[in-house]
Structures are given as structure tokens and as C-alpha cells.
Regions:
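Terminal targeting signals and extreme-terminal segments of soluble enzymes
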Residues: 1-82
Length: 82
């Protein structure tokens, strides 16, 4: 994805992620070394005390970290988290 800015690059990949779509997540900012993802709080994503379930938090943290790395990666590379 040569010639595109960090936000466009991240969103282009992000839109292919089924889990992020299921969560209703959205990339609201991406620049060199940073990616901000927002998820609306819904009952289906909470634990018994109405906070986000840890699995949601972990998935968003892993995804945001991976995309922050992608903003620093060469245009012909992808980044995966495991």
C-alpha cells in the first residue's frame, strides 16, 4: 500500500478483520507508532459487573499494538499478533 498515509493503511487492513466487525470496533486515529481503536460498550461485550470482558480488552490491545507497529513497517510488509 505504497503512497497512502498511516490511517488509510491501517483502516484498509482493519476492515478485513471479522472480529473487529463483530465487536463494532473502529480505528479513530493512526499515525507513526500509534493506533487508537474505539469499541462501543454493549451488554454482549461485558462481564457480570458490566465492565468490558477481559477478552475484548485483550483483543483490542493486541490489535491496536499490531497496527501501531504497522504504521512503522515498510509498505510491502504486514504485521500479525499472536
Amino acid at each position: 500500500m505504497s503512497g497512502v498515509g498511516p490511517l488509510e493503511r491501517v483502516r484498509g487492513s482493519f476492515e478485513k478483520q471479522g472480529l473487529m466487525a463483530l465487536l463494532g470496533a473502529e480505528v479513530v486515529e493512526a499515525r507513526s507508532g500509534l493506533c487508537v481503536i474505539e469499541v462501543p460498550l454493549r451488554d454482549e461485550l461485558t462481564q457480570q459487573e458490566r465492565y468490558f470482558h477481559g477478552a475484548v480488552t485483550g483483543a483490542i490491545a493486541a490489535t491496536a499494538g499490531g497496527y501501531a507497529a504497522l504504521t512503522r513497517a515498510p509498505p510491502d510488509r504486514e504485521v500479525l499478533t499472536v
